């Protein structure tokens, strides 16, 4: 396969539609205005070529008509963001992925698979990874676990990297923390593509026995400790879980968790 075909194969997704983004010269709050929309036509090799040449930007819809995926992503839209530090942490965690700079200057953390994985399993594990990174509230692609094609459902698309590949700002980070060329990106995709069963079996940190009935994402957060900056989000989720677990004693239970796991504990006024 040539380089265009390899790039298209990496982002194989929904057959009958794709996304497009038109960027105007007009700016708002320092950012270029963009219009994104779904096109109910297949993502073709010609469209991929135009994307890589910087003519028309495209996006791929990860979830296919069978609710399975060949790729997925975390979309971290917080600033400032250190892509090199995120990439290093993910490699330390031994998570097979490729970190790219997004269109808006955030991070797209792409997961690639050598076989189809169910959208639900992908989203579950991706949420654990996001939580362990400290970005538990970020967007996950696919956004849906299930679509009903017979009623016209189409999943959400994610903008692809390497728009205008020769001088792109949507580049991957290589092992040395440098922007990777398109060819190097495709080498990283090949090297870091993973079997779905291996991906689902990834573990991070310690599991906390007292939260074994809670979601894996929340358990993961308590296993690594709750640093300042993420306490409100995590403790809100914990409050919901406590109400289900101990409806008559949830406030006391929540405060015990707060004192034990938050560093420093969340003030009572919050």
Where are these regions (language model features)?
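DNA replication initiation on ssDNA origins
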Residues: 1-71, 80-86, 157, 162-165, ...
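Short secondary-structure junctions
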Residues: 15-20, 95-99, 137-138
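Catalytic cores of nucleic-acid ligases and guanylyltransferases
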Residues: 29-45, 65, 69, 75-88, ...
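Short amphipathic beta-strand starts and helix->beta connectors
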Residues: 52-60, 90-97, 220-225
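Short, well-ordered loop/turn elements at secondary-structure boundaries
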Residues: 54-55, 67-69, 92-94, 103-106, ...
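Short beta-strand
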Residues: 61-64, 97-104, 139-143
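Modules that initiate DNA replication and primer synthesis
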Residues: 76-79, 88-91, 105-122, 127, ...
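Aromatic- and Lys/Arg-enriched surface recognition patch
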Residues: 123-171
């Amino acid at each position: 396969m040539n380089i265009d075909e390899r790039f298209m194969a990496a982002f194989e997704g929904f057959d009958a539609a794709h996304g497009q983004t038109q960027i105007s010269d007009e700016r708002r709050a320092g950012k270029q205005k963009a219009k994104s929309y779904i096109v109910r036509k297949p993502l073709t090799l010609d469209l991929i070529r135009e994307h890589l040449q910087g003519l028309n930007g495209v996006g791929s819809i990860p979830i296919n008509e069978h609710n399975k995926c060949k790729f997925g992503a975390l979309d971290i839209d917080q600033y400032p963001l250190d892509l090199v530090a995120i990439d290093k942490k993910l490699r330390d965690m031994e998570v097979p992925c490729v970190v790219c700079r997004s269109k808006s200057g955030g991070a797209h953390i792409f997961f690639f698979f050598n076989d189809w994985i169910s959208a639900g399993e992908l989203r579950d594990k991706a949420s654990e990874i996001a939580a362990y990174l400290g970005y538990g509230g970020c967007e996950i692609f696919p956004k849906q676990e299930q679509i009903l094609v017979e009623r016209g459902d189409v999943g959400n698309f994610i903008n692809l990297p390497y728009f205008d590949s020769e001088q792109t700002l949507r580049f991957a980070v290589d092992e040395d923390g440098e922007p990777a060329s398109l060819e190097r990106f495709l080498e990283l995709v090949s090297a870091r593509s993973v079997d779905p069963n291996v991906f689902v079996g990834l573990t991070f940190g310690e599991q906390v026995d007292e939260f074994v009935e809670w979601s894996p994402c929340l358990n993961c957060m308590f296993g690594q400790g709750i640093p300042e900056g993420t306490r409100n989000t995590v403790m809100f989720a914990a409050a919901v879980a406590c109400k289900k677990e101990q409806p008559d004693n949830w406030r006391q239970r929540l405060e015990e968790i707060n004192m034990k796991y938050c560093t420093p504990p969340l003030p009572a006024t919050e």
